[in-house]
Amino acid sequence: MNSLFASTARGLEELLKSELEALGAHDCKIVQGGVHFQGDDRLMYQSLLWSRLASRILLPLNEFKVYSDLDLYLGVQAIDWPSIFGVDKTFAVHFSGVNDEIRNSQYGALKVKDAIVDSFTRKMDQRPTVAKQQPDIRVNVFLQRDMASVALDLSGEGLHQRGYRDLTGQAPLKENLAAAIIQRSGWQPGTPMVDPMCGSGTLLIEAAMMASDRAPGLHRGHWGFTAWNAFNEALWRELTTEAQVRARRGLLETSSRFFGSDIDRRVIEMARANARRAGVAELITFNANDISKLVNPLPEGPVGTVISNPPYGERLESEPALIALHNMFGRMMKTAFGGWRLSLFSASPELLSCLQLRADREFKAKNGPLDCVQKNYQLTANPLGAGGALVAEDYANRLRKNVKKLDKWAKQQGIECYRLYDADLPDYNVAVDRYGSKVVVQEYAPPKTIDPQKARQRLFDVINATLAVLELPSNQLVLKTRERQKGKNQYEKLAQKGEFLLVSEYNAKLWVNLTDYLDTGLFLDHRIARQMLGKMSQGKDFLNLFAYTGTASVHAGLGGARSTTTVDMSRTYLEWAEKNLRVNGLTGQQHRLIQADCLSWLSNTDEQFDVIFIDPPTFSNSKRMETTFDVQRDHLVLMKELKWLLRRKGTIMFSNNKRGFQMDLAGIAALGLEAKEITALTQSEDFARNRQIHNCWLVTHSQEEK
């Protein structure tokens, strides 16, 4: 009787135990990451050939205490290695774990290798060769605290490598995990199975192998036991011959049929090739199709199971499309697959909620480093596709109401960019902005007291509802997460798509970028202020400080300004401003662009202007600025500098976004200036609920100064 250990992915231990017991294993004991079991040689080879769930089968050789590297060396050398494999064979060591003395797995592997080689040289005066690629013998050493376990890896390569999958698409599932997903799905051999997002076909092929009684190890070309001195070749030949007979018979007798589709034709060709190598190609029908074209391949029956591992996004920009995909998929399941079972495996339970289906079973498992969930559903017939209530219904109703009012208003105003929703409801803390044909959803970062998974779920519900209410294709929605910006992070670059969209604002055309930066290049709340500046600037010299993308300069220029001067520290934004000016025909020497620290430039210029617009950051500590800037603390210093640039009958429009900003009116008067708040005049209909989004002032020379 052999003592053996079968390893597997975490979360699959109970399934593996049941599988080994069905094969005839005795004394099965679950530990994290695997199962200890007992069995004779036949059972040992059967487990290697037939286990669909095990990652490796190990034969323990020795276990000993390790307090130093010498203990490790002596414990390994105590094993009679020449009795295990011949000196003419190659070997490799896999070492995992550390303790206070063995702090590096590579060092541990080196000590084990030395001990094995020295064992041969002392007894035979010869040494075996180490081979990193496909060695004849693999030695597995696991160190946990002060205990080391040495085992012969009978598998060689991991058992998930069945031998049929040479080519894979992106993010493939390991075959043993795919087998576990199928077993947990409730699918029964003899019934049909559909995978509408099949990738390289692993789920379908594994199920077809189960249905046709094909041993998962039948196609492997390399094993870790064939160079073992105790290898029973006759017994192995008997078992593999028996498995081949069963596979041929199973292929003829199975009534199961399998259907797979994927949008990627190249991946579908890989799937077909994989199925041919696995010997189950005649059972599986593959098609290259977009999931939106999914139909039930057996509308008249029998009913079966839909099993899939749908895509999930690690990048924020992919989430709207994935949310739309899951929502559409849920509707298709209800309309076309009534009476079927559905089982989905995903690293994103929040995306699965977008199906709007109620799961009746749920399992957890690891897919490499990812925590994943598998959910099973019973699909009820629903030919009209009517689901339950729309997710985030309160939000959807508010958005629908706002859209009805604001779309009409915006058309009358002659604007394409405006806010549709701004955290109107506390549970849905997002801003929704329309930019022509596209929509930007910005999530305000939730408080730390809110469960991150709950916040993510709520965001997904918002996106789902936004797409539905606005009848928007998912590629027209851009998702951003907005946090309170401080100093150098305020213009942080998020992506590098370089996609610009030309939009209209009154008589101006402006370039926006919805993906690459936290902001889009157009501050919507300053729309009326820009319009006012256009009217104020006719025949005047206009200065735009902290100019960002120069949108105020565009309005001033279109309003008939004699000249515009646009100053910003960022080369990127000045180039953007130049594009904005050029698309409106505002070119030539009278439209200057200056890259400079605005505060330093103010101190060093002797020019004068009729209209000055300044919208400084609330706080800034840019590397290019010598000191920090705080708008509340420093606005008087700013006004003192601006006074010398302002012509006698000129006007400064001063705006900022600091909530609770207090203008030092006494200090302003002492400078010989007058300030008048015009915040209410600059706030538009789409920002009616957020009166504190900015404050705005007109500052002029006092009567005495004039």
Swiss-Prot record:
InterPro entries: 23SrRNA_methyltr_KL, DNA_methylase_N6_adenine_CS, RlmKL-like_Mtase, RlmKL-like_Mtase_CS, RlmL_1st, SAM-dep_methyl-trfase, SAM-dependent_MTases_sf, THUMP_dom. SMART domains: THUMP. It catalyses: guanosine(2445) in 23S rRNA + S-adenosyl-L-methionine = N(2)-methylguanosine(2445) in 23S rRNA + S-adenosyl-L-homocysteine + H(+); guanosine(2069) in 23S rRNA + S-adenosyl-L-methionine = N(2)-methylguanosine(2069) in 23S rRNA + S-adenosyl-L-homocysteine + H(+). Its EC number is 2.1.1.173, 2.1.1.264. It is found in: Cytoplasm. Keywords: Cytoplasm, Methyltransferase, RNA-binding, rRNA processing, S-adenosyl-L-methionine, Transferase. One of its GO terms (cellular component) is cytoplasm. The keyword RNA-binding applies. Pfam families: Methyltrans_SAM, RlmL_1st, THUMP, UPF0020. Residues 43-154 form the THUMP domain. It is an enzyme of class 2 (transferase). Its main location: cytoplasm. One of its GO terms (molecular function) is 23S rRNA (guanine(2445)-N(2))-methyltransferase activity. Specifically methylates the guanine in position 2445 (m2G2445) and the guanine in position 2069 (m7G2069) of 23S rRNA. NCBIfam families: PRK11783.1 (NF008748). Belongs to the methyltransferase superfamily. RlmKL family. This is Ribosomal RNA large subunit methyltransferase K/L. It comes from Yersinia pestis (strain Pestoides F).
